[in-house]
């Protein structure tokens, strides 16, 4: 599974890379984030595995996409 954030304002994608077979063996805190993200949002990261979720960033919304290879 490839995990990436999409900035819904600029449409830029930030690839978080593949993590194991399902990603479940990686702590959200281990994910190397780039850009303006709120770390506290990652507490809910694995709660939204497999579906799309919107988080409020410092200046805009960020969309989390999970794509199966």
Sequence positions of predicted segments:
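Well-ordered beta-strand positions in beta-sheet-rich domains
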Residues: 23-25, 45
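Short, basic/aromatic beta-hairpin or loop at an interaction surface
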Residues: 1-21
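Short, well-ordered loop/turn sites that connect or cap secondary structure elements
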Residues: 26-32
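Short, solvent-exposed secondary-structure boundary/capping segments
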Residues: 54-67
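A structural detector for beta-sheet-dominated domains
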Residues: 5-6, 27, 49, 65-69
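Short beta-strand-centered aromatic/proline hotspots
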Residues: 44-53
């Amino acid at each position: 599974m490839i995990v990436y954030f999409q900035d819904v304002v600029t449409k830029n994608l930030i690839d978080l890379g593949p993590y194991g077979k399902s990603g479940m063996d990686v702590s959200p805190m281990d994910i190397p984030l780039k850009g303006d993200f709120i770390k506290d949002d990652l507490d809910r990261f694995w709660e939204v595995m497999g579906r799309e979720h919107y988080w409020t960033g410092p200046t805009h919304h960020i969309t989390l996409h999970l794509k199966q290879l």
